[in-house]
């Protein structure tokens, strides 16, 4: 990572440059804003460490101009004259951190490493989105929330391997879409993607569906039939709701995954098969293993790489963009939701996740009385949830305050000094309110 240090004190520049260079970073230095702009315009700088109070342009002024040149650049502001108001100003301008001198180098290194991880995730998300632009996937994957950005980053890494993948997620979270994405980004993307909904297969037909049968293998087998494993040869096989596979058939599935060979029902010939398995479920697979409803050895065979998709209620930042996508997809005329309706949609918990949101938008478009969809046009359960969550004025204010505190703490990595500065309150007040609302870092 390329880091630019901007400080008018040569001793501070040299100290930071020497320390960071020893950690393996590519470090550039500037004594003032003009030097910083010259370097920034010619070098791919990813992090700028700025002194807040310098001769000429201040750190805030330099930061504002650098952000105008590249909004994606990360920045730390350092100062010997720290106070809440200056910290708030810098953070609002886009600084990631506000650090006081003398700088604790170990803390600085931790924060830089955290930024590195963020940059890697952002680059992988950008790469995935670029790939989706040229894909035939039916829906763009919305990932503004940190949770979904992590999902796309992990999926991108998984795609580069050949191991089996297990996707966990509630109904309607997009497990099928993620399976398609992993296949699309993999080396098998020019081969087939076979999707099997295990929940839709009658128990007595599972073996035939998965492995095929020979003519005359059983009553009604009038001709030879190739199963999904055979059809997926060379590509990816996606077994959705894999927990529905009968316990009696699981040993054969395990054997095929281990030996990469199988025979059709009624056949003697062993057929070689080369597939990448992606399995998914909305159930607690570990609990099923403990209850004896799913084989433990098969559990470990399919769970080499695991990916969990967060429910929509944990990625509310994505809801407005998802709504726009569904409006563009299903509406034949310009139409939008009122602010009140949009607020209700963002707050609703969505037990059916993205699929439920999609159906809500489809219904709203169908019954729209004009170009504006209002709260009264939404389903009763959403209006009821909005009404029951409004509460008294005091309850509303407390809910808003708690949400603001939690947002500031999460944005500041639970560093209380930075969170307090972001909110414009003292650390003592922040600690009091954290106790009041029982806010704790559980990660």
Where are these regions (language model features)?
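Acidic catalytic/metal-coordinating carboxylates
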Residues: 32-35, 58-61
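AAA+ ATPase active-site-proximal loops
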Residues: 129-272, 277-283, 288, 328-367
């Amino acid at each position: 990572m390329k880091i630019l240090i901007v400080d008018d004190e040569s001793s501070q520049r040299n100290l930071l440059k020497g320390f960071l260079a020893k950690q393996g970073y590519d470090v550039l230095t500037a004594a003032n804003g003009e030097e910083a702009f010259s370097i920034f315009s010619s070098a791919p700088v990813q992090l700028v460490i700025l002194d807040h109070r310098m001769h000429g342009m201040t750190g805030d002024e330099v930061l504002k101009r650098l952000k105008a040149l590249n909004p994606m650049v990360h920045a730390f502001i350092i100062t010997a004259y720290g106070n809440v108001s200056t910290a708030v100003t810098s953070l609002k301008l886009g600084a990631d951190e506000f650090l006081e001198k003398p700088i604790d180098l170990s803390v600085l290194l931790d924060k830089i490493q955290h930024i590195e991880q963020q940059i890697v995730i952002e680059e992988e998300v950008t790469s995935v989105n670029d790939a989706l632009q040229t894909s035939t996937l039916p829906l763009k994957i919305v990932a503004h929330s940190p949770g979904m950005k992590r999902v796309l980053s992990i999926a991108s890494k998984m795609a580069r391997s050949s191991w089996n993948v297990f996707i966990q997620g509630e109904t309607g979270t997009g497990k099928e879409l993620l399976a398609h994405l992993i296949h699309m980004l993999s080396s098998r993307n020019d081969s087939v993607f076979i999707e099997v909904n295990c929940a839709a297969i009658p128990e007595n037909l599972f073996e035939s569906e998965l492995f095929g049968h020979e003519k005359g293998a059983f009553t009604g087998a009038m001709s030879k039939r190739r199963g999904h494993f055979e059809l997926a040869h060379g590509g990816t096989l996606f077994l959705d709701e894999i927990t529905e596979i009968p316990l009696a058939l699981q040993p054969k599935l395990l054997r095929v995954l281990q030996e990469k060979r199988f025979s059709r029902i009624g056949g003697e010939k062993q057929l070689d098969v080369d597939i990448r398995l992606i399995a998914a479920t909305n159930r607690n697979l570990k609990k099923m293993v403990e209850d004896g409803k799913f084989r433990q050895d098969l559990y470990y065979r399919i769970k080499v790489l695991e990916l969990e998709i967060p429910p929509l209620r944990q990625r509310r930042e994505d809801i407005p963009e998802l709504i726009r996508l569904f409006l563009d997809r299903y509406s034949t005329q310009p139409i939008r939701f009122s602010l009140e309706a949009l607020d209700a949609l963002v707050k609703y918990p969505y037990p059916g996740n993205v699929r439920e949101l999609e159906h809500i938008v489809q219904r709203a478009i169908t019954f729209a009385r004009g170009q504006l969809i209002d709260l009264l046009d939404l389903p009763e359960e959403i209006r009821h949830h909005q009404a029951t969550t409004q509460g008294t004025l005091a309850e509303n204010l407390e809910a808003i305050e708690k949400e603001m505190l939690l947002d500031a703490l999460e944005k500041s990595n639970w560093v209380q000094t930075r969170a307090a500065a972001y909110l414009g309150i003292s650390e003592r007040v922040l600690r009091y309110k954290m106790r009041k609302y029982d806010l704790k870092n559980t990660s």
